[in-house]
A protein has these predicted regions:
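Acidic/polar, low-complexity intrinsically disordered N-terminal segments immediately downstream
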Residues: 1-74
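Pocket-edge structural micro-motifs
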Residues: 38, 89, 113
């Protein structure tokens, strides 16, 4: 599966992502990628896998890079990003059942790529903020002492 010399740019990027970050970028998800997710069962999360067209997937990868990955260093992604990022065409939030752009669990982050071509710059900025918020929420929730603030930070001035 992993081939950093592949002529298929999607397979090549997925391979490079794995070897660079020791994490997975999943473009053809099935329920085993998010349902049990190592520690808990996410049986309410509903996704529609992305269309398995190389150009569609490549645009999704570029979208992910532009809105999220390019903001962080290799070391940061290796140390703090979820074990897998899962690209999907559609997703329903497991709490409210409404369409969602992204969803994180302890070891994964699902990112929708279906309507990426139709987004205005403002919508892209909002989507990017949602992705960053989801990643930082996941980091804050699951990593002890990630952000070590001095006691003085909490005093009211």
């Amino acid at each position: 599966m992993y081939d950093t010399n592949s002529s298929n740019k999607v397979i090549k990027f997925i391979s490079q992502y794995y070897y660079t970050y020791d994490h997975f970028l999943i473009t053809d998800p099935d329920s085993s990628d998010y349902l049990y997710n190592f520690s808990s069962k996410n049986e309410l999360l509903e996704i529609t896998p992305p269309e398995q067209d190389e150009e569609h997937l490549w645009k999704g990868i570029e979208f992910l890079k532009e809105l999220l990955l390019d903001f962080y260093s290799t070391d940061f992604i290796k140390s703090h990003f979820p074990y897998s990022i899962i690209l999907v065409d559609e997703m329903a939030d497991p709490v409210f059942g409404l369409p969602a752009n992204c969803y994180t669990g302890r070891y994964f982050c699902c990112v929708t790529i279906q309507d990426m071509d139709n987004m205005s710059p403002e919508e892209k900025a909002f989507y990017s903020a949602e992705l960053h918020e989801a990643i930082w929420f996941q980091i804050g929730l699951y990593e002890e002492n990630f952000l070590d603030l001095p006691d003085g930070f909490f005093t009211i001035s």
